[in-house]
Amino acid sequence: MAWQLTVPELQDQLQCPICLEVFKEPLMLQCGHSYCKNCLDSLSEHLDSELRCPVCRQSVDCSSSPPNVSLARVIDALRLPGDTEPTVCVHHRNPLSLFCEKDQEFICGLCGLLGSHQHHRVTPVSTVYSRMKEELAGRLSELKEQHRDVEEHIGKLVNNRTRIINESDVFSWVIRREFQELHHLVDEEKARCLEGVESHTRGLVASLDMQLEQAQGTQERLAQAERVLEQFGNESHHEFIRFHSITSRGEVQQARPLEGVFSPISFKPALHQADIKLTVWKRLFRKVLPAPESLKLDPATAHPLLELSKGNTVVHCGLLAQRRASQPERFDYSTCVLASKGFSWGRHYWEVVVGSKSDWRLGVIKGTASRKGKLSKSPEHGVWLIGLKEGRLYEAFGCPRLPLPVAGHPHRIGVYLHYEQGELTFFDADRPDDLRALYTFQADFQGKLYPILDTCWHERGSNSLPMVLPPPSAPGHLTRAQV
């Protein structure tokens, strides 16, 4: 025999129409409907007139309602072990089987029909329980999700904290190492300065010792001559006169010091006290620059008049154009050539030998800058240059161009690029230990930058001297980490 009802539907059929709970001590009325014994007793107590069945409205007699034994057995068979009995209404002694949604209170069936809750919205406790169970499950799911989010957030915070500590430890180590190297360099410069002072002092003292030795010899001869003269003064008249012209005159002449022998010496060191810090700073600055880059020129970018040699490290402007393929990266008007290596981050230093050229330009250019037609020499077009014009005017190519007060004629130009700080500085690099800044561009660099050399026109041979990328000098540099 197949069952037509599910367990929830069966529970609905076993509910008392008054308390809406599973029957407890069910009684069967004459009409055939069943009710809880307590529900019928409470209902009959509150009604003065005859009792009518709440379901079919048929007049019934509660006193002759027998227990519905079969229904009670079915309920007992379906009841789970350990099911707790509902609490009882203090007013009607009926089970608190309903829940008043307005007052948020548990009530019995009579409270909903006859009491203060009769016009309120009431719901069976089981329904409220199921609803709240679902709400609790939803809330629990939200809390678990929030808990997972918080755990994930805590994990990220812990990882972030660990990363910060690790990065701090690494950076602290770098600082200690850098300062250790700086202290070493300062100690070297200190020893160098002291050695210079001591060497200068030794020379001065040696000169004074020689003069002192000469003066002491003269002093001894004078004392000897003085003793001879005193001895002659005790001789007889004849003896004194006889030996006077022979002996004493020669002794006195020999002992007489030459005029102007003593020449005072002043302590004048090559390094003045007020210049110590500046001089040492210049020497240290040269050493803390990045190691010079080893650069080569890119033939694919060279103007047809340019001739490259010595492993693409030397370029000069010739009189005849070279046969070169027309490529997008090649300059077709300006006599320029790029280095094959570009920079998009970090600190870099390189040098260019310009010699005695009367006209030249050098600097950096964006890889995306146009190379066709006349080169637009300005930072607005991605070109940062300085140069020499007609052998007398140094200038920085900005907007507008800026004349540079350069002392002398540098034969070697140093270029220092700090990409992240947006700095491009040019130096007079003729004296390795005394770099002199010529000009600094400030810019927000974007994309890859390439060193650029512009030999300018050969001027019928008068400006045909080459520009050279010298090999980097190995010693004397402190290579600093990029941090």
UniProtKB/Swiss-Prot annotation:
Residue ranges that the Swiss-Prot or TrEMBL entry lists as coiled coil: 127-169, 203-236
The B30.2/SPRY domain extends over 275-474
Modification after translation is described as: Auto-ubiquitinated. Acetylated by EP300 and KAT2B. HDAC6 drives TRIM50 deacetylation. Acetylation antagonizes with TRIM50 ubiquitination.
According to the entry, what is the taxonomic lineage of the organism? Eukaryota, Metazoa, Chordata, Craniata, Vertebrata
Question: PANTHER family this protein is in?
Answer: E3 UBIQUITIN-PROTEIN LIGASE TRIM
Q: Which residues bind Zn(2+)?
A: C89, H92, C111, H117
Pfam families registered for this protein in UniProt:
PRY, SPRY, zf-B_box, zf-RING_UBOX
Could you tell me which species this protein originates from? Rattus norvegicus
| Zn finger intervals (B box-type) | 84-125
> This protein is called what?
E3 ubiquitin-protein ligase TRIM50
Q: Which GO terms describe its molecular function?
A: identical protein binding; ubiquitin protein ligase activity; zinc ion binding
Q: Zinc finger (RING-type) residue ranges?
A: 16-57
